[in-house]
Amino acid sequence: MTTIITVRKGGKVVMAGDGQVSLGQTVMKGNARKVRRIGKGEVVAGFAGATADAFTLLERLEKKLEQYPGQLMRAAVELAKDWRTDKYLRNLEAMMLVADKSTTLAITGNGDVLEPEHGTTAIGSGGNFAFAAARALMDTDKSAEEIARRALDIAADICVYTNHNIVVESLDVEG
């Protein structure tokens, strides 16, 4: 699978993900880019799960963002509704993290759109490890990017489906 984390701290929101693509127990690729900017560069998105499914969902989310510009929550809720109810989409196996300057969301195929309350959240096979590491580092003087990178490094040390090839995207936040 993979690990994707987002950290919101110090005027930045940072999303980071590893680059490993596994097929069963075999590493097929080590430098995949699972974190990217969408929505005219105003949204960062990361995905875990089946790669083709995740790209399908990213395309759908981009269309929703075109329909509802500047409204990440609305676009995410509309995507989650489609994902849960559409005969084709509901079979897709992926999760997504998305963030803009004011909101961070986790979107699942069960129709969940979750907003984290501690400034960080993570998904994927190493998500729990990365989340715990980031939570422990949130009260330090480390920047959002430093926390995200360290949390992913810790997850990669523990999770065999996560590697140390980290891709980071960041946005300035409101407030």
From Swiss-Prot:
Protein purpose: Protease subunit of a proteasome-like degradation complex believed to be a general protein degrading machinery.
Protein name, per record: ATP-dependent protease subunit HslV
Activity modulation: Allosterically activated by HslU binding.
Binding-site residues for Na(+), renumbered to this chain: A156, C159, T162
Similarity comment text for this entry: Belongs to the peptidase T1B family. HslV subfamily.
Enzyme class: hydrolase
Listed EC numbers: 3.4.25.2
Top-level taxon of the source organism: Bacteria
Biological classification of the source: Bacteria, Pseudomonadati, Pseudomonadota, Alphaproteobacteria, Hyphomicrobiales
Subunit relationships: A double ring-shaped homohexamer of HslV is capped on each side by a ring-shaped HslU homohexamer. The assembly of the HslU/HslV complex is dependent on binding of ATP.
Name of the gene this protein is made from: hslV
Cell compartments where the protein resides: Cytoplasm
One MF term in the entry's GO annotations: threonine-type endopeptidase activity
